[in-house]
Curated annotation (Swiss-Prot):
It comes from Mycobacterium tuberculosis (strain ATCC 25618 / H37Rv). Belongs to the DarT ADP-ribosyltransferase family. Residues 135-183 are annotated as: ADP-ribosylating turn-turn loop. The active site is at 67 (proton acceptor), 183. NAD(+) binds at residues 30-32, 39, 47, 67. Toxic component of the hybrid type II/IV toxin-antitoxin (TA) system DarTG, which plays a crucial role in controlling bacterial growth and bacteriophage infection. Its toxic effect is neutralized by cognate antitoxin DarG. ADP-ribosylates ssDNA, preferentially in the motif TTTW. In case of phage infection, DarT toxin ADP-ribosylates DNA, which inhibits both viral DNA and RNA synthesis and leads to abortive infection. Disruption phenotype: A double darT-darG deletion shows no change in growth in culture, upon infection of mice or upon exposure to a variety of stresses. Another group finds the double knockout gives a competitive advantage over wild-type cells in liquid culture growth experiments. Residues 26-230 form the DarT domain. The lineage of its organism: Bacteria, Bacillati, Actinomycetota, Actinomycetes, Mycobacteriales. Its EC number is 2.4.2.-. GO terms for molecular function: DNA binding; glycosyltransferase activity; nucleotidyltransferase activity. This is DNA ADP-ribosyl transferase.
Length: 230
């Protein structure tokens, strides 16, 4: 499982690294608090926000509330659902929301240390026949669009921005922050067996994570990369 990544943004892919023409190779990232891993392991899956109450909440509640009311409808055959009915994965791990969580907000002030990135290859999501779609920006934003056309995904999202370190809005481009938060949304759940990459901020959290995950079995790549956080 050789991967290459853009350290500026945390955009990771198998083989030669992120390529707009090979979205199947992209590794997409769901971050959570290490406290939540026992519940995930017991369930055997990552569950949508609408179906789970985490042990330690890190999400920013105003955004969570918006996601509960954001309709996801990439096409007429997609299940009637809201953004909160999906398991969210960021295409570039160093997302604007990760910045908010690492720096602290009204609901969480624990910093980056206890956070865990769980990585899944988009191709594995597709091969598992899960219902998924991509957002071209923050899935909570009113103007965000959705697609499940994998062949055009590299142009549907802002690929170049997903490779860059800086994502703040500018006068000329007031939606950069949203586009840098492009997501892969998986409807309902993701079997934990699809998680093939685990990234932690420090050794302390990785030791805790390995103690929990090693008995579960499966093949996963474990890395400590503080640069994948803020």
């Amino acid at each position: 499982m050789i991967t290459r990544y853009k350290p500026e943004s945390g955009f990771v892919a198998r083989s030669g690294g992120p390529d707009r023409k090979r979205p199947h190779d992209w590794i997409v990232w769901h971050f959570t608090h290490a406290d939540n891993l026992p519940g995930i392991i017991t369930a055997g899956r990552l569950l949508a926000d609408s179906a789970v109450t985490p042990t330690t909440e890190v999400a920013y509640n105003p955004v969570k509330e918006l996601r509960r009311h954001k309709v996801v409808a990439p096409d007429s055959r997609y299940p009637a659902s809201m953004a909160s009915d999906h398991v969210p994965f960021y295409i570039a791990a160093r997302s604007p929301m990760l910045y908010v969580v690492c720096k602290g907000h009204s609901g969480y002030s624990g910093g980056a240390g206890p956070l865990v990135h769980l990585g899944v290859a988009l191709g594995d999501i597709i091969d598992a026949d899960l219902t998924w779609c991509a957002s071209d920006g923050n899935a909570a934003a009113s103007y965000t669009k959705f697609s499940r056309q994998v062949d055009t995904l590299g142009t549907f999202v802002d690929f170049d921005l997903l490779c860059q370190r800086q994502w703040h809005n500018t006068d000329d481009d007031p939606n950069r922050q949203s586009r840098r938060a492009a997501e892969i949304l998986v409807y309902g759940h993701v079997p934990f067996e699809l998680v093939s990459y685990v990234c932690c901020y420090n050794t302390e959290t990785m030791t805790r994570v390995r103690t929990l995950l090693d008995p579960v079995g499966g093949v996963r790549k474990y890395v400590i990369k503080p640069g994948m956080y803020y």
